[in-house]
Design a protein with these regions (language model features):
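Hydrophobic alpha-helical segments, chiefly the membrane-spanning helices
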Residues: 1-331
Length: 331
């Protein structure tokens, strides 16, 4: 048991560090060869930070641990909203851009709805089993390309170009990329094997491990980023990062993962997909129930932006605790 837990923890840490080094090395190489900061942010950084979930998804599906493959994605999406944004908004009101409210959050909701639709062949098309096939993966990637086009368009419009990517020597950058990839591969293997062993030793389902420990572990970068942003009074970036990550998880990770190896769905996971949909709806409602106002002159106040307030954050955390309680009850 101790060995399995150590494998799981070590695997998650290696995934996080491997993704960090992969992004650092790849960004440096891209910068050195004249790639713009905008394109680095859209491609290298965005894809690199999604590598932990991608590696866990691929390894678990190849090893036949389908519940971990899907549970990691669904559980990560739930944790990103209810846990990560819940904690961040309790620390400080989290501002939300109008484009995020009306475009990205609905797109995140669409992603989960599409996932549930495609993962229920046995109910919709009366197939013997429900499976995410390679054709489903191609459809996910088609949605993902539309999302990338939207992000590129919005960033150019808002002039949100990230600066500060460090340019290192080519050998050093290649070293970072190589070591990062190695850590990701090893971390993915250790995480999945540790999760499978823990589930077997404790007599609990692999879905439970995937939806909780593995999902929270792979969501740690989003949690740390969002909490630090809230502490540094830059909480407005938290929602965009979380919502973008949720869209990436479904359209990019499930797309690539199912093309490499189709994934079967346990019907019990439909309840978790429903919770992921509910969490996204709760987020959409939360950003409309709180507003920050700015006083102009003496009496007139103008609405400044949508926010997720502390009360909303508490509600989100309570919902997440209730969900964990449900998972324990379900086993």
């Amino acid at each position: 048991m101790i060995l399995a837990l150590a494998m799981l923890i070590a695997g998650i840490l290696l995934l996080i560090k491997g993704a960090d080094w992969l992004v650092e090395g790849s960004s440096s190489l891209a910068k050195r060869f004249g790639v713009s900061d905008l394109m680095i942010g859209l491609t290298v950084v965005a894809f690199g930070t999604s590598m932990p979930e991608l590696l866990v998804n691929i390894v678990s599906s190849v090893e036949g641990a389908n519940d971990i493959a899907i549970g990691n994605i669904v559980g990560s999406n739930i944790a990103n909203i209810l846990l990560v944004l819940g904690i961040a908004s309790i620390i400080r009101n989290v501002a939300v851009k109008t484009s995020t409210v009306w475009n990205e959050i609905p797109l995140a909701l669409l992603a989960v709805l599409v996932l549930q639709l495609m993962a229920n062949d046995s109910i919709i098309d009366h197939y013997p089993v429900s499976e995410l096939s390679r054709s489903d993966g191609l459809a996910f990637l088609a949605f993902f390309l539309i999302f990338l086009w939207y992000v590129a368009k919005m960033r150019r419009r808002e002039d949100e170009i990230e600066n500060g990517f460090v340019e290192r020597g080519v050998p050093v950058s290649i070293g970072f990329v190589s070591i990062g990839l190695g850590l990701l591969l090893l971390g993915g293997k250790l995480t999945v094997d540790g999760a499978i062993d823990i589930a077997s030793l404790l007599g609990i389902s692999q879905a439970f491990i995937g939806l909780t420990i593995v999902a929270i572990g792979t969501s740690l970068p989003e949690l740390v980023t969002s909490v630090l942003a809230a502490v540094r009074k830059k909480a407005d970036i938290a929602v965009g990062n979380v919502v973008g990550s949720n869209i990436f998880n479904v359209f990019w990770i499930m797309g690539v993962g199912t093309i490499i190896h189709p994934v079967r769905l346990d019907p019990a996971l439909n309840a978790d997909l429903f919770v992921a949909i509910l969490a996204t709806v709760v987020l959409f409602i939360a950003v409309h129930t709180g507003h920050v106002h700015r006083r102009i002159f003496l009496f007139w106040r103008q609405r400044q932006e949508h926010v997720i307030g502390r009360t909303d954050g508490v509600i989100m955390l309570l919902l997440y605790v209730a969900y964990l309680g449900y998972l324990v009850w379900r086993g």
